[in-house]
Amino acid sequence: MSQFIDFTLPSTVPGRTLHGFRCVPEGQVRAVLQLSHGMVEYIDRYRPLAEYLADRGILVTGHDHLGHGASIRTKEDYGYFAEPDGNRAVLADLHAVTVLTIIEGNAELLAEDE
C-alpha cells in the first residue's frame, strides 16, 4: 500500500508557498517520477495516477504551480505565475521540488499541458 505525504515549501518567488504531495511505494523504490501539471490544472488531479504508479514501485511527486490548485492565495492569483519572468519562477520551483525529492535511482519528469 502506498503512502501519500503532503508537503509545502517556499516558492522561489518571495512570500509565496508551493503545495504538493509525494506518493511513496511500500518496499523498494524502483524509480522516481515528478509530475508537472498543465495550465489551469492542479496536482491533486493526479493522485489516482500517483497511487497506481506507487503500487508498482514508483515514487511520485508533484506540486501546484503558482496560481494553481492549493498554491492560490486569492482569486486574483488564479492562473498567474509571477512578475517579472513567471516562466523562470515555474522552472526554478520545479527544480526546488526535484532537489527535495532526489533519491538514488532513476528520476523522470512527466509534464502535461492540453
Q: Predicted regions span which residues?
A:
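Secondary-structure boundary motif
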Residues: 26, 55, 103-107
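Gly/Ala-rich beta-loop-alpha elbow adjacent to hydrolase catalytic centers
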Residues: 111-114
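Divalent metal-coordination and catalytic microenvironments
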Residues: 46
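Conserved alpha/beta-hydrolase
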Residues: 50-76
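Alpha/beta-hydrolase active-site loop
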Residues: 82-109
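N-terminal cap/lid segment of alpha/beta-hydrolase-fold proteins
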Residues: 1-27
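Active-site glycine-rich loops that stabilize anionic/oxyanionic intermediates
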Residues: 35-41
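Alpha/beta-hydrolase fold active-site loops
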Residues: 30-34
